[in-house]
Curated annotation (Swiss-Prot):
Leader peptide range in chain numbering: 1-20
Gene expressing this chain: cgt
Native organism: Brevibacillus brevis (Bacillus brevis)
Lineage of the species this protein comes from: Bacteria, Bacillati, Bacillota, Bacilli, Bacillales
Protein name, as recorded: Cyclomaltodextrin glucanotransferase
Top enzyme category: transferase
PROSITE patterns assigned: CBM20 (PS51166)
Length: 692
């Protein structure tokens, strides 16, 4: 039988792509990620367990290896546990070889964050053949694989003790590159540990006792970029550890390298505490080329439903503010708990976890479920929050809720792409609507211990009666919507959630997602949405048409056109010449990117005045002082009055630039004399120093 999509493909002589499949590695909007600490999930092959002091039989010592491996994950895909849960992406522990030594306090590298060789596997998880089977099994089940990645550091080390653990040693496929206390090639920073007092301090000093890479070192830069490409042959996504502790400039050059080689969805960890809002966090998410774990979402939902220190007004304010602060809020990765915080179910009733999961799965962003949350696994802080999975019960309420809402995310584009509108709110009740085109999801949450009758509720749902998509797993009722959009005063049961929806695909083009959101001319970009039509139209970057690689009604792949570097709005024009609303702020890069450290000596300033750099390419602000890069640093790698900053700039490019000073009122003082000139390297990194 020939499917309609095959007929269309033949007519256009273009391949078609299926939305929300494993082939779309840059769009996770409709996916549900399941985070696994590999060592703690399932032991599928006891033969690869470690021996001796680093292994804990029956996991009685949570600081040690417990036996979980890739075969265990494969088994749980094959027996249907993960697929029936509705999971479409697995975030696994960093798969690379980690240190074997036992820390003096009894700690081990079971978590995967103490790398020693990024070009080898952790043998306690499996070998490369096992990893290939993990990925192929996942893909056959419609599941993507995301790997953790730690380009910030190797492993624990002390300047004064070369025998401490493994001295931060770094290997290149078995060959020693260097170690921390005998760092002849200057692979690491030697500035002591960070006290987290400033952004600069957190970047250029060690995070705790972890040997901090000097990412401005050409050997380190090349090695890390080579290493991730080895894994990119198989994987579908990357979670980058500790992005707050590396320069944005180097990380942007990394993302440019990845997107040119094999674009995959990438998100980073920038930890925020309860109630913490950091503009630098937003800037990074908007400019670096990668998304972030959404700690504002995670901390707020925990405050509302777990700790009961906030209410739904606070949650709604967070939703509204982050929609403004993040250019791509649907690409931020949301959660209710993870490996760096206490388990959500630690001090709450099971129904509170159920409510939190329902909100997570119907809110904007890419939802991530920490392994065992669906089993109400408890635990305090590390390592208690990393207990082994004991049961794989498919009858828990959380398992059923996740399964139903994961399925709805796949079917209804409002959950993947839609905006959020608050429809009714008080301290205990939150009713919010997600809408994309004609598809709508209305979610009603009552987190109080008493029933609530809702008056004056309005919605975009069409006239009709709607049953709860959760089938009363959380005591949701039906709702009746009138022709004018008013609802007939529904009653919400105590501690309940109801989800009502209509799925109706748009017949005119609507862009829901573009990924990645940075790229140079010729890079492949995927445009997802609805109503594109089966016949090829066009995709515009501003007013310039892009080369079409593939086209379907819900997904288009294009090549970034040859346009001047800068930000562009994208739009889709279908075959009947109907144009979509613009999708804003795609950044066209000037070319391949390299990280360069710019430094200027003798730049004295008054209190409240900072130094910036501006120049002749988009990456340096195109001579616009409002887009100048900075404020620059002056405390760690260089001391005031020398200022410095690591910046991603086009490779092999003749650059012109100047330094400027900005005071707290925005007044600008330009560096005198001719423009500074410099040719960036074709590959690698560099440092260029001039005088004020």
């Amino acid at each position: 039988m020939i499917t309609p999509s095959f007929i269309i493909s033949s007519f256009l002589s273009l391949p078609t792509v299926v939305e929300a499949s494993v082939t779309n590695k840059v769009n996770y909007s409709k996916d549900v990620i399941y985070q696994i600490v590999t060592d703690r999930f399932s032991d599928g092959n006891p033969a690869n367990n470690p021996s001796g002091a680093i292994f804990s039989q029956n996991c009685s010592d949570l600081h040690k290896y417990c036996g979980g491996d890739w075969q265990g994950i494969i088994n749980k895909m094959n027996d249907g546990y993960l697929t029936d849960l509705g999971i479409t992406a697995l975030w696994i522990s960093q798969p690379v070889e980690n240190v074997y030594a036992l820390h003096p306090s009894g700690y081990t590298s079971y978590h995967g964050y103490w790398a020693r060789d990024y070009k080898k596997t952790n043998p306690y998880f499996g070998n490369f053949s096992d990893f290939d089977r993990l990925v192929s099994t996942a893909h056959n089940k419609g599941i993507k694989i995301i790997m953790d990645f730690t380009p910030n550091h190797s492993s624990l080390a002390l300047e004064t003790n070369p025998n401490y653990v493994e001295n931060g040693a770094l290997y290149n496929n078995g060959a020693l590159l260097g170690n921390y206390s005998n760092d002849r090639n200057k692979l690491f920073h030697h500035n002591g540990g960070t006290d987290f007092s400033s952004y600069e301090d957190s970047i250029y000093r060690n995070l705790y006792d972890l040997a901090d890479y000097d990412l401005n070192n050409k050997v380190v830069d090349q090695y890390l970029k080579e290493s991730i490409k080895l894994w990119l042959i198989k994987i579908d996504g990357i979670r980058v550890d500790a992005v707050k502790h590396m320069s944005e400039g180097w990380q942007t050059s990394l993302m440019s390298d990845i997107y040119t080689y094999k674009p995959v969805f990438t998100f980073g960890e920038w930890f925020l505490g309860t109630g913490e809002v950091d503009p630098q966090n937003h800037h990074f998410a908007n400019e670096s080329g990668m998304s972030l774990l959404d700690f504002q979402f995670g901390q707020t939902i925990r405050s509302v439903l777990k700790d009961r220190t906030s209410n739904w007004y606070d949650f709604n304010e967070m939703i509204k503010s982050t929609e403004k602060d993040y250019d791509e809020v649907i690409d931020q990765v949301t959660f209710i708990d993870n490996h760096d915080m206490s388990r959500f179910s630690m001090v709450v009733f099971n129904f509170q976890t159920d409510i939190a999961l329902a909100v997570l799965l119907t809110s904007r962003g890419v939802p991530t479920i920490y392994y065992g949350t669906e089993q109400y696994l408890t635990g305090g802080n590390d390592p208690d929050n990393r207990k082994p999975m004991k049961t794989f019960d498919r009858s828990t309420n959380s398992y059923k809720i996740t399964s139903k809402l994961a399925s709805l995310r796949q079917r209804n584009s409002a959950l993947g792409y839609g905006n959020t509108t608050e429809r009714w709110i008080n301290s205990d009740v939150y009713i919010y609507e997600r809408k994309f085109g004609n598809s709508i999801v209305l979610t009603a949450v009552n987190s109080s211990n008493r029933n609530q009758t809702i008056s004056n509720l309005n919605t975009s749902l069409p006239q009709g009666n709607y049953t709860d998509e959760l089938q009363q797993l959380l005591d949701g009722n039906t709702i009746t919507v009138n022709a004018n959009g008013s609802a007939n005063s529904p009653q919400l049961q105590a501690n309940s959630v109801a989800v009502w929806q209509v799925t109706k695909e748009s017949t005119s083009p609507l862009i829901g997602h573009v990924g990645p959101m940075i790229g140079k001319t010729g890079n492949t970009v995927t445009v997802s949405g609805e109503g594109f039509g089966d016949k090829k139209g066009s995709v515009l970057f501003g007013s310039t048409s892009a080369e079409i690689v593939s086209w379907s009604n819900t997904e288009i792949q294009v090549k970034v056109p040859n346009v001047t570097a800068g930000h562009y709005n994208l739009s889709v024009v279908n075959a009947t010449n109907t144009k979509s609303p613009a999708y804003e702020k795609f950044e066209v890069l000037s070319g391949n990117q390299v990280s360069v450290r710019f430094a200027v000596n003798n730049a004295t300033t008054n209190s409240g005045t900072n130094v910036y750099i501006v120049g002749n390419v988009s990456e340096l602000g195109n001579w616009d002082p409002n887009k100048a890069i900075g404020p620059m640093f002056n405390q760690v790698m260089y001391k005031y009055p020398t200022w410095y900053y690591d910046i991603s700039v086009p490779a092999g490019k003749n650059l012109e630039y100047k330094y400027i000073k900005k005071d707290h009122n925005g007044n600008v003082t330009w560096q005198s004399g001719n423009n500074r000139t410099y040719t960036s390297p074709a590959t690698g990194t560099d440092t260029v120093i001039s005088n004020w």
